[in-house]
Swiss-Prot record:
Organism this protein belongs to: Pseudomonas putida (Arthrobacter siderocapsulatus)
Lineage: Bacteria, Pseudomonadati, Pseudomonadota, Gammaproteobacteria, Pseudomonadales
InterPro entries in the cross-refs: ExbB/TolQ_transport, MotA_ExbB_proton_chnl, TonB_ExbB_1
TM segment ranges: 18-34, 112-134, 220-241, 266-287
Name of the featured protein: Biopolymer transport protein ExbB
A GO BP annotation: protein import
Record-level Gene Ontology MF annotations: transmembrane transporter activity
Disulfide bridges in this chain: none
Function statement: Involved in the TonB-dependent energy-dependent transport of various receptor-bound substrates. Protects ExbD from proteolytic degradation and functionally stabilizes TonB.
Superkingdom, taxonomy of origin: Bacteria
Record carries keyword DNA-binding: no
Cytoplasmic side: 1-17, 135-219, 288-329
Keywords: Cell inner membrane, Cell membrane, Membrane, Protein transport, Repeat, Transmembrane, Transmembrane helix, Transport
Length: 329
C-alpha cells in the first residue's frame, strides 16, 4: 500500500490570506506617516503660546485615530505680540538719546520764546563787557591826565600863570581855570571878596558834578543788566519747563530721557541770565569805586583853582591898599 506524500506548496487559502495582509499593511503605512508630522507640529504651537490656559492634547500617533480629529496648530513663524508700553519706552529712549545736549544744540531745540530770551541775555552780556573795556580805558586815561594837571596847578603861583600852563582846550584844568577867570572878570567892579569866592566856588562845584556825571555815563546800563538779567532768565526757564510739562502730557510718559532735554533747555536760560548779571554787578561796583576816586581828584583840582583865586584877590586888595606918595611943592 503506497502512502501519499504531502505537497510542499501552500494551499490556496493561505496564499490569499498572505496577500490580503500585505495589501492591508501597504494601505495603513501612508496613514501612519501622515499622522506623525501632525503630532510633531502641535508641540511647537503649544510652546509658542504659554499664556493659553489649557493646551489641546496632541493626537495619538497610531493609525486608530482619524486624521480629521487633530486640532488646528498655530503656524510656527507667527509674530509674537509686543506690549505697547515697551514699544513706547524704546521709542522715547531713542528720542531722548537723539537730543544734542550741548549749549548750541539746546539753543537750536528750544522754543522760540526761550530763544528770544537767550539772544537778549547774550546781547546784554556783550554790552557789559564792551562797557567794561571802553569805560576802563577812559577812566585810566582821565586819571592819568588829571594827576599831571593837578601837579601843574600846584606849581602855579597865580591864576594867570595857571591859565598859561593849562592852555590845552578840552582838559579839565583848562575848563576850571577858564571859568574862574570868567567869574572874576564879571565881578571886577565888586569890592566884596567873599562874594567873588562864593560865586567862583559855586561854578567850580558845578563843573565837578558835571565831570562826575560824564564819567558815570554808561554805568547805569550795568546796574540795569545786573538787576534784571536773572529775572529774564527765570522767565525763560519757567516758559521752557511749562512747554516740557505740556510735552509730557502729550506723550503720556514720564521717562527721564524724554523730559530731561526740555528741562535742560529751560535751565540754560537761567544760566545765561546769571552769566550776564554777575559780571555786570561786579563791574558796576568796580566802576563806582573808580569813579568816586576820579571825583575826588577833580575836587582836588577845583580846590587848587579856588586857592589861586583867593590868592589873586588878596594880591589885588593889597595893591589897592598900598599908600601912594604925593610930591608937594
Amino acid at each position: 500500500m503506497t502512502r501519499t506524500q504531502p505537497s510542499a506548496s501552500p494551499t490556496p487559502s493561505r496564499a490569499w490570506r498572505a496577500i490580503a495582509a500585505l495589501m492591508f499593511s501597504l494601505v495603513l503605512a501612508p496613514v501612519a506617516m501622515a499622522d506623525e508630522p501632525t503630532a510633531n507640529a502641535s508641540t511647537p504651537a503649544a510652546a509658542a503660546a504659554p499664556a493659553t490656559p489649557a493646551a489641546a492634547p496632541a493626537p495619538a500617533a497610531d493609525g486608530s485615530a482619524p486624521v480629521a480629529d487633530a486640532p488646528a496648530a498655530a503656524p510656527v513663524d507667527a509674530p509674537v505680540a509686543v506690549d505697547p508700553g515697551v514699544e513706547a519706552l524704546v521709542e522715547d529712549t531713542t528720542l531722548g538719546m537723539a537730543h544734542d545736549l550741548s549749549p548750541w544744540g539746546m539753543y537750536k531745540n528750544a522754543d522760540i520764546v526761550v530763544k528770544i530770551v537767550m539772544i537778549g541775555l547774550a546781547i546784554a552780556s556783550i554790552i557789559t563787557w564792551t562797557i567794561w573795556i571802553a569805560k576802563g580805558f577812559e577812566l585810566m586815561g582821565a586819571k592819568r591826565r588829571l594827576r599831571g594837571e593837578i601837579a601843574q596847578l600846584k606849581k602855579s603861583a597865580s591864576l594867570k600863570e595857571a591859565s598859561e600852563v593849562s592852555n590845552k582846550e578840552g582838559t579839565l584844568a583848562h575848563t576850571l581855570v577858564h571859568d574862574a577867570l570868567e567869574e572874576m572878570r564879571l565881578s571886577a567892579n565888586t569890592r566884596e571878596k567873599e562874594g567873588i569866592k562864593e560865586r567862583v566856588a559855586f561854578r567850580l562845584e558845578r563843573l565837578v558834578a558835571a565831570s562826575g556825571r560824564n564819567m558815570s555815563s554808561g554805568t547805569g546800563v550795568l546796574a540795569t543788566i545786573g538787576s534784571t538779567a536773572p529775572f529774564v532768565g527765570l522767565f525763560g526757564t519757567v516758559w521752557g519747563i511749562m512747554n516740557s510739562f505740556i510735552g509730557i502730557a502729550k506723550t503720556q510718559t514720564t521717562n527721564l530721557a524724554v523730559v530731561a532735554p526740555g528741562i535742560a533747555e529751560a535751565l540754560l536760560a537761567t544760566a545765561l541770565g546769571l552769566v550776564a548779571a554777575i559780571p555786570a554787578v561786579v563791574i558796576y561796583n568796580v566802576f563806582a569805586r573808580s569813579i568816586a576816586g576820579y571825583k575826588a581828584q577833580v575836587s582836588d583840582a577845583s580846590a587848587q583853582v579856588l586857592l589861586l583865586v583867593s590868592r589873586d584877590l588878596d594880591h589885588q586888595g593889597s595893591e589897592r591898599a598900598a599908600p601912594h606918595m604925593v610930591k608937594v611943592g
